[in-house]
Amino acid sequence: MDEEFQRVATKILAAEEAGNSPEAAALKASIEKNPSDHESRLHLAAVLAAQSQFEPAFQTLLESIQIDRAWNEQAARKRMVEYFTLAKEQPELVRRYRQALSTLLN
């Protein structure tokens, strides 16, 4: 698949998920109450990514991976890799979080 097409498709999916998710404050409250709430973490990352807030989105996904990397067939890891394409205009940020992800998985 063409890289630009993939980037646009990922952005649309993030926006759709963000539109169907509770607000960020409610998601953060849910995560604070239950740190293992991976579903809320995934939704929060989508909300943040849809707003081009990639660093907090990546951090949210890394935290989910730290808690349980296998959850939902590694959904957080897969989502993080997808969001790297959205943040391609911030190569240093992507490099840091790719490295952090690699370190966490190895």
Question: Which residues does each predicted region cover?
Answer:
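Short coil turns that delineate tetratricopeptide repeat
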Residues: 35-36, 52, 69-71
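Alpha-helical adaptor scaffolds
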Residues: 1-34
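Structural motif corresponding to the intra-repeat A-B loop/turn of tetratricopeptide repeats
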Residues: 16-18, 51, 87
